[in-house]
Amino acid sequence: MPDMQKRPDHRRIPISKVGVKDISYPIVVMDKNRSLQHTVARVNMYVDLPHQFKGTHMSRFVEILNRHREQIALDKLETILEEMKARLGSASAHLEIQFPYFIDKRAPVSGARSLMEYSCEFSASLTDTLDFVLGVRVPLTSLCPCSRELAIHGAHNQRSIMTVRVRYRDFIWIEDLVELIEQCGSSPLYSLLKRVDEKYVTEQAYENPRFVEDMVREAYSRLAGMENITWFSVETENFESIHNHSAYAAVELDRRG
């Protein structure tokens, strides 16, 4: 049968990324307790396309994914990327995996246990060498220092999302990264709180007011102190409770030299 993708394209323009996006797929992730979490990810797969070809073979991406269906885990990403390059005749391959990850957390006073969900991502690219980025989105509470200073009865507070992405030399557990991030807001979030816990986290937030600027600077200071990390970016969005907009701040550090 005719292969339209291999036909020449007269415009002769190379494409940096082409492929399939937003595939829902089961994966396996090991947690810090050395147990396996089975979760469902959204997967994006791309390769570059040389200027002389009209199109890529979209079906091959899914075939590759299916072939590794029992092995889609962190230590298998480079193997998948190598196969993408080989099967699709490309110089570079890219794989993005976003998934929910659960951590067993205890309430701060009662000790009540519950699962807390965090949105995580693996982003991997392969040309000559592997480039891997770990990302986590962590919900926090932020309490406004200005409001606390001005108001007689309390201060406005809101939920915030801090997104941290890191490149590292040696393996970092998702749990350790989450724990670091949760120290950067006014208070962590919990899935389950009893009354004694609710009192504690409310007072903790009030005694630890943070602007969005404070939060990214705190994360920067903590991440910069980890020599294992070669690059990081931090973004924080505060979903303001007294405004019809969000507050936002971002920082980045690159030590790859």
Swiss-Prot record:
Cysteines engaged in disulfide bonds, as pairs: none
Keyword entries, A-Z: Hydrolase
Pathway: Cofactor biosynthesis; 7,8-dihydroneopterin triphosphate biosynthesis; 7,8-dihydroneopterin triphosphate from GTP: step 1/1
Reactions the enzyme catalyzes: GTP + H2O = 7,8-dihydroneopterin 3'-triphosphate + formate + H(+)
Gene Ontology MF annotations: GTP cyclohydrolase I activity
Pfam family, one: GCHY-1
Entry's Gene Ontology BP terms: tetrahydrofolate biosynthetic process
UniProt-annotated site: May be catalytically important, residues: 144
EC numbers, comma separated: 3.5.4.16
InterPro entries to which the protein is assigned, alphabetical: GTP_cyclohydrolase_FolE2 (IPR022838), GTP_cyclohydrolase_FolE2/MptA (IPR003801)
Enzyme class: hydrolase
Family: Belongs to the GTP cyclohydrolase IV family.
Function: Converts GTP to 7,8-dihydroneopterin triphosphate.
Protein name: GTP cyclohydrolase FolE2
Species of provenance: Pelobacter propionicus (strain DSM 2379 / NBRC 103807 / OttBd1)
Taxonomic path: Bacteria, Pseudomonadati, Thermodesulfobacteriota, Desulfuromonadia, Desulfuromonadales
